[in-house]
């Protein structure tokens, strides 16, 4: 059995979990998330805890029990606390501005870049060089952050570009004559 799946998922008081044979739905103050289930993992509810176990002894079922436990834990955390991803812009003239569900970026191209936010993700720009993404779905928040970073990834010689706030960019040494 997966070691991750041995730990139960605690359900906070303000979170509601609906478990059916082919779907699990988690709703809370920050939204509602659902996940389709396969028959490889058996989920049991014991009061305020969810326990996960492999339905069969196959390697795939044991691996999926830990994966599903992590996904459900992220869903419960997302609808109760939410997830945040911060990006910083480094470079002369690089700036970001949030306008409703759009993020307008000036990244040194000949044209401005506009990125539309998907449902469930909000964007804020506390300063022109900072972007804060928040949402209930960890996968979607991370995907949007990766898409924004891909517009101008940090280059290795000066480090200019869009980077995660906690990212360390290793700067290469320039060529010596």
From Swiss-Prot:
Keywords: Ribonucleoprotein, Ribosomal protein, RNA-binding, rRNA-binding. The keyword RNA-binding applies. One of its GO terms (cellular component) is cytosolic large ribosomal subunit. GO terms for molecular function: rRNA binding; structural constituent of ribosome. It comes from the Bacteria. The keyword Nucleotide-binding does not apply. It holds the Pfam family Ribosomal_L6. One of its GO terms (biological process) is cytoplasmic translation. InterPro entries: Ribosomal_uL6-like, Ribosomal_uL6-like_a/b-dom_sf, Ribosomal_uL6_a/b-dom, Ribosomal_uL6_bac-type, Ribosomal_uL6_CS. Belongs to the universal ribosomal protein uL6 family. PANTHER family: 60S/50S RIBOSOMAL PROTEIN L6/L9 (PTHR11655), LARGE RIBOSOMAL SUBUNIT PROTEIN UL6M (PTHR11655:SF14). This protein binds to the 23S rRNA, and is important in its secondary structure. It is located near the subunit interface in the base of the L7/L12 stalk, and near the tRNA binding site of the peptidyltransferase center. Part of the 50S ribosomal subunit. NCBIfam families: L6_bact. This is Large ribosomal subunit protein uL6. The lineage of its organism: Bacteria, Pseudomonadati, Pseudomonadota, Betaproteobacteria, Nitrosomonadales.
């Amino acid at each position: 059995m997966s070691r991750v799946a041995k730990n139960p998922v605690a359900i906070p008081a303000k979170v509601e979990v609906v478990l059916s044979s082919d779907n699990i739905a988690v709703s809370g103050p920050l939204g509602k998330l659902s996940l389709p289930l396969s028959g490889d993992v058996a989920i049991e509810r014991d009061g305020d805890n969810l326990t996960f176990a492999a339905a069969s002894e196959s390697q795939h079922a044991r691996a999926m029990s830990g994966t599903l436990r992590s996904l459900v834990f992220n869903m419960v955390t997302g609808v109760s606390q939410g997830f945040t991803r911060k990006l910083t812009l480094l470079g002369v003239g690089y700036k970001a501005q949030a306008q409703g569900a759009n993020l307008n970026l000036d990244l040194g191209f000949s044209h401005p870049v506009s990125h539309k936010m998907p449902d469930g993700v909000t964007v804020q720009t506390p300063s022109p060089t900072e972007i804060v993404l928040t949402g209930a779905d960890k996968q979607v928040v991370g995907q949007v952050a990766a898409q924004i970073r891909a517009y101008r990834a940090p280059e290795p010689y000066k480090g200019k570009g869009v980077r995660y706030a906690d990212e360390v960019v290793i700067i290469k040494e320039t060529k010596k004559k």
